[in-house]
From Swiss-Prot:
Transmembrane as UniProt keyword: yes
Pfam families xref list: DUF846
Single Gene Ontology BP annotation: vesicle-mediated transport
Name this polypeptide is given: Golgi apparatus membrane protein TVP23
Glycan-carrying positions: N2, N26, N30, N127, N140, N155
Species this chain originates from: Candida albicans (strain SC5314 / ATCC MYA-2876) (Yeast)
GO CC annotations on file: Golgi membrane
Compartments (UniProt record): Golgi apparatus membrane
Cross-referenced PANTHER family: GOLGI APPARATUS MEMBRANE PROTEIN TVP23
Biased composition annotated in UniProt, kind: Low complexity: 26-38
Length: 267
């Protein structure tokens, strides 16, 4: 209380010391009575704390439809998710669904549906989803290479030698303008499912070997080869580092964890 009065002491006359004593009692009573009035304002945020869950509801996990609305190409993203997930789901639960309709030729119908879904996934990813979601596309083309196959001895017509025609298989990678905006939701879903599907097929292939399902293993080999082809092609096509950084991060973490587990000197 003394420090508070020193700030206002020069404003009061020096010849009236009793007024200070009187004011001391008044101010002390005022401060003591004013404290209860100020305490509700201090404790008022504590009373309002039950309203915080209402404000935290905006931070709840968003649903799939809400994320699709934030996508730049929601229809393309929806078809991409469908074609990437449906072959694996059909492989696991397809026979159960087919048995609900017919019990004849179950394996043949299941195999045909799987082939159609894998082919549709390969075409959609290669031609539509990669171009719209991340601005990448690749294709394969065959070029003609002409090479002279002569021995250097000319003939009467002046021809030096015959030209041999050969064909070369060329991979063409196309990347969009680096200044183009890539939606982060589209990019994350694209790269996650691009690398996640081959891993799922490998796991299912191991299970097929353990169950001695060699016909299904043949299909899994085809599906894995198509999925790995798309994964490697889009990784090479991405020359601006969107996939390379993601793949390098995953591979370095996996290699580091394996090295730490098998390193006898690190323990």
């Amino acid at each position: 209380m003394n420090s508070s009065y020193t700030a206002i002491e020069p404003d009061e006359p020096l010849d009236s010391p009793p007024s200070y004593s009187a004011n001391d009692h008044n101010t002390t009573t005022n401060t003591t009575t004013s404290n209860p009035s100020t305490q509700p304002y201090v404790n008022q945020p504590q009373a309002d704390q039950p309203q915080q869950p209402g404000t935290s509801s905006s931070f709840e996990p968003r649903t799939l439809l809400q994320r699709l609305k934030e996508s730049s190409h929601p229809i393309a993203l929806l078809f991409y998710i469908f074609f990437r997930v449906s072959p694996i789901v059909t492989y696991i639960f397809g026979t159960i669904v087919i048995h609900q309709f017919t019990s004849k030729n179950t394996f043949i119908l299941h195999f045909i549906v799987l082939i159609l879904l894998v082919a549709g996934d390969f075409w959609n990813l290669k031609n539509i989803s990669g171009r719209l979601l991340v601005g990448l596309r690749w294709w394969n083309e065959t070029t003609l290479i002409e090479s002279e196959n002569g021995n250097g001895n000319g003939n009467a017509s002046g021809q030096v030698g015959e030209s041999a025609k050969d064909f070369e298989n060329v991979w063409v990678f196309e990347t969009a303008d680096p200044n183009r905006y890539i939606n982060p939701i589209d990019s994350k879903v694209f790269w996650l499912l691009l690398y996640g599907q081959p891993v799922a097929w490998v796991v299912l292939g191991v299970l097929a070997v353990l169950k001695l399902q060699f016909l299904y293993l043949l299909f899994i080999i085809v599906a894995t080869s198509l999925s790995m082809t798309n994964a490697m092609a889009f990784t090479k096509c991405d020359k601006f580092g969107k996939a390379n950084n993601f793949a390098n991060d995953v591979f370095t973490r996996a290699a580091g964890s394996m090295f730490n587990n098998f390193n006898p000197f690190g323990r």
